[in-house]
Amino acid sequence: MSSPFVPIITADIDWRDDLPYSLQFDDIYYSAEGGINQSLYVFVEGNNLINRWQQLPTNESNVFTIAETGFGTGMNFLLTWKLWEKFAPQNARLHYISCDKHPLKKDDLIKCLQKWPELSVQTEKLIEHYPVLTPGYHHLAFSNNRITLTLMLGDVLECYEQLLFCGDINLEHQLRESYVNAWYLDGFSPSKNQSMWSDNLFTVIAMLSKESTTVATYSASSIVKTALTNAGFVINKRKGFGPKRHMICAHYEKAYSSSKKNRHTPWHINYPVTKEERTALIVGGGLAGCFIANSLAKRGWEVTILEEKEKVGCGGSANQQAVLFPKLSIYKSPFTQFMLYSFLYANDVYKELLKHYNLGELKGSLLLAHNEREKANQQSLIHWLELYPELGQLVDEKQSSELSGISLPCGGLFIPSSGWINSPELCDILIDNKRISLITGNRVQSINYNQKNWVVNDIDASVLILANGQQVNYFHETNHLPVKAIRGQMTTIQSTQESTKLKIPLCAEGHVLPALNNSHRVGASYDIGTSEPELNALDDQLNLDRLKRIAPDIIWSQNVLDHWAGIRAASPDYLPIVGPLPNALEFKEIYSELKSNSKRWIAEAAPCYPNLYVCAAFGSRGLTTIPLATEWLAGLINREISILPRKLIQAISPARFLRKKIIQGP
């Protein structure tokens, strides 16, 4: 199902006496006497954070999670970040989750944060990574992943509700291994913004909390006290900041009930399984395997990659100029949402890498309007791109020629933040970590579980991740996964004096990359169902014919210098397959009643193989979608609160195909 994307309405700010005032809520963001001192008193001291941080274990797998109901100027986040780096153990990690229905535009944010020069170091980084304000989730990493921010743009209840597994208070706590440690209830006053202080929101907050979870807010409203008490929190009154008489602190004790109408059968998640050690085996050394290895190693896990070839970055990940670009749409569906979230996150990841490594270029790419259908699709984006010009710009024939550096026959969609990345080199960089071991020439034909660890080719680990592309369904446990092989061949040709003027990737029916080492890479064929990467001259000619149609006025060399073929793995819905692997027979038995009612509440988690995960089927957009998917998966394995909403976790879940079969029949 799809519906139109509803754009975010940014904050309407009026500056009064050099202070930001919200016209939407008829309230001030902070008072003249407030700001940092108020944040320190209310939220940091109100949650006893510094003392709690100093008692944390000193390992990278430990994550302290703070959740906030209103991001506003970001000052609470920046102050927390600064204090975390000063008082928390060096290896511990902070996950800060926040939400805003009407976020500040970047210019307004800069003006607000200029008031606090003591936060200038953190402010500069936040401004650099401040996201395009599209609806949904944005995940940002700072301080080499020691600080992460999940910024959710939209209604606060809807956003936080999506962090729940099922919405049933009893089952939620049985399933949940990750909780919020401290809450900052910070929004405009209850009389101005009632949705920020609703009973329903506090019920969700309770389901994301455990007995040690604390809450702090500047408010002492009876509405807030009652809502927190009803949700299972014990209230502690404290003197308010400055002239305020009181503020509220609280700690979670026990929630008593939840709404039955908001329950969702948790078919996508399994009951927690003990992990004796923080060790992981990854089958497959392509982009997916290397990214998940990197994400786990950053969390202190010992990782071993088993790769069939002689090195990582082979097979479908061997493209030396892979193109990064989004799939933009005015319609909101699991596919378009996942593609947008993934592109924005991947772009941030690659920009950081390019500061240190010569891996490629992010100077933009051009999607040509090469036929009427593509032209109509691009024209449908006009309003969306007016709101979000950072995502793309529609250009005419003259502009496309100027942007690309060569004569082109049509206009198109210019994606300013896209470009190309050398995938094999990226794989090498990702596994350059003392916690990652690589074993090459290791073909995996079976996997075994010994009631404690997974054993593959006499190597064992507590967690097993299958990231082996089209071969992911070769095992007994995975043979129900509907993965299809798609062969693609790239052709390398000599550059000419004229063709070297090409500055950015061009994409149409095929695509061509700017010259690198006096040659262009042109591609790519798309052979569904072909699982063998044999090279053939017919595909070279197909690529050259498409190249002529992309830029017919340019004299392209017909001299084929080299060619390469890889096998993409894709799912029927072209979303990746990422998450815990269900036992197919048990799944069908437990959820058989979904056939008569797909929304039926079944109070059972998915029957999954213990600590066995899939990370595959990224198709032709792996460079775009793998970074976010693997970061989410690493967080799940490491018992962290999700950086993806439930609806997208379900959209990429390995269990979705079994559920669909139950509902629709064979």
Curated annotation (Swiss-Prot):
Protein's UniProt keywords contain Transferase: yes
A Gene Ontology biological process term: methylation
Named cofactor requirement(s): FAD
Matches recorded under Pfam families: DAO, Methyltransf_30
Chain spans, region FAD-dependent cmnm(5)s(2)U34 oxidoreductase: 283-666
GO molecular function, one term: flavin adenine dinucleotide binding
UniProt-annotated stretches for the region tRNA (mnm(5)s(2)U34)-methyltransferase: 1-253
SUPFAM superfamilies for the chain: FAD-linked reductases, C-terminal domain, FAD/NAD(P)-binding domain
Entry keyword annotation includes Metal-binding: no
EC number: 2.1.1.61, 1.5.-.-
Known function: Catalyzes the last two steps in the biosynthesis of 5-methylaminomethyl-2-thiouridine (mnm(5)s(2)U) at the wobble position (U34) in tRNA. Catalyzes the FAD-dependent demodification of cmnm(5)s(2)U34 to nm(5)s(2)U34, followed by the transfer of a methyl group from S-adenosyl-L-methionine to nm(5)s(2)U34, to form mnm(5)s(2)U34.
Record-stated family: In the N-terminal section; belongs to the methyltransferase superfamily. tRNA (mnm(5)s(2)U34)-methyltransferase family.
HAMAP family for the chain: MnmC
Protein name, per record: tRNA 5-methylaminomethyl-2-thiouridine biosynthesis bifunctional protein MnmC
This protein's encoding gene: mnmC
